[in-house]
């Protein structure tokens, strides 16, 4: 299956990298690469492996060794990554809480 990242998810990855880079630039790049690689590896083979999402029509992928949640949807043959955020964030009060499954922005 094909995996596509929304602009919102790409912005999330940029923000994650910028935040971590304040203290450790090398770790910042490694973290983002790990999120992207693990997400692709898991979802391209097992698109339903995430748990049902808190937003209707989504699923959530959580990796124990990476403290980030990947919100995605699978409306057909393409997996759409909608958002990525740290598990310590308050999901209900995220500034980008308005995740819409369609259309992707």
PLM regions with names:
Residues 7, 31, 37-45:
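Outer-membrane beta-barrel domain signature
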Residues 1-33:
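Arg/Lys-rich, positively charged N-terminal/basic patches that mediate binding to nucleic acids
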Residues 68-69, 73-105:
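Enriched for short, Lys/Arg-rich terminal
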Residues 20, 24, 43-47, 88:
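A general structural signal marking secondary-structure boundaries and capping sites
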Residues 36-37, 45-79:
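Basic/aromatic recognition patch in beta-strand/loop cores that engages polyanionic ligands
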Residues 13, 17, 36-40, 65:
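Short amphipathic alpha-helical/adjacent loop interface patches that line ligand
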Residues 23-24, 28-31, 51-58, 83, ...:
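Solvent-exposed interaction patches of small proteins and small membrane subunits
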């Amino acid at each position: 299956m094909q995996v596509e990242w929304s602009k919102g998810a790409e912005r999330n990855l940029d923000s994650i990298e910028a935040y971590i880079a304040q203290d450790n630039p090398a770790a910042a790049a490694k973290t983002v690469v790990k999120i992207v690689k693990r997400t692709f590896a898991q979802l391209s083979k097992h698109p339903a492996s995430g748990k049902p999402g808190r937003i209707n029509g989504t699923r959530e992928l959580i990796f124990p060794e990476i403290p980030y949640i990947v919100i995605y949807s699978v409306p057909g043959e393409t997996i759409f990554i909608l958002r990525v955020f740290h598990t310590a964030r308050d999901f209900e009060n995220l500034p980008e809480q308005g995740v819409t499954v369609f259309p992707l922005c």
